[in-house]
Amino acid sequence: RAALMMGGKTVDEIYWWKGKGFDTLAGRKTLPSVAALNAAIAAQIDKARPAYATPAQCVAHSAKIMHGDGKSVGDYAFQRPEGAASIYRASPDFDHSILGAATAVINEMDLGQGEATDVISVGLSATDYIGHAFGTEGLEMCIQMSELDRSLGEFFDVLDGEGIDYV
C-alpha cells in the first residue's frame, strides 16, 4: 500500500513486502540486489530468533499485562520460535529489511550519483504493526523505537558515506 501510494503509476522500481520477501509489479524483474536480499531473508525468516536485548530506557516499560485466553502484552522482546515467519512484520527486523532493500536499490541503480535528482520513498511499517499488535506503551514499542533509531542511523550513515543528499 505505501509503495503504491508513494510511487504512483510510473516508477522505475517499486517493491513491497509479500510473505517472505519483497515483490514488485507483475511483468517486472526484481533487481538482482533485491533478489539477493530476498534469498537472505528467506534463509533466516523461519529460524528461531533470540530476544532483543532490553535497552536501559526500556526497562521501566516492561510490564506483563494479561488479556484474553492467557495472552499478554508489555514484555515481549521479539524472540521468535522456529517456523514463526508470520510474526516477522510486527518486529524491528521488518523495518531493518525494508531499509536493506532501499540500500540495495540505491546502490544498484546508483541513485544520487548523477546530475538529475533521484527520489526514493521508503515506507517503514513495523511501528504500525507493533502498535496494533501490542499497544504503544510497553516493552515492544520501546524496543521498536530504539531499533528503528539504530537502523535509520545506519541507513543515513550509508547515504552520508556515499555523499548522497537527503531530506
Regions found by a protein language model. Give the residues of each.
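His/Asp/Glu-rich, glycine-adjacent segments
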Residues: 1-116, 125-132
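Residue-level recognition of well-ordered secondary-structure positions
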Residues: 103, 121-123, 153
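Aromatic-residue detector
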Residues: 110, 114, 118, 140-141, ...
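Loop/turn elements at helix/coil->beta-strand transitions in domains of secreted/extracellular proteins
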Residues: 113-120, 163-167
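Short, surface-exposed, charged/polar-biased interaction segments
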Residues: 123, 141-143, 166
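Active-site-proximal segments of metal-dependent phosphoesterases and phosphodiesterases across multiple
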Residues: 136-149
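Metal-dependent active-site segment of extracytoplasmic phospho-/sulfohydrolases and closely related
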Residues: 146-167
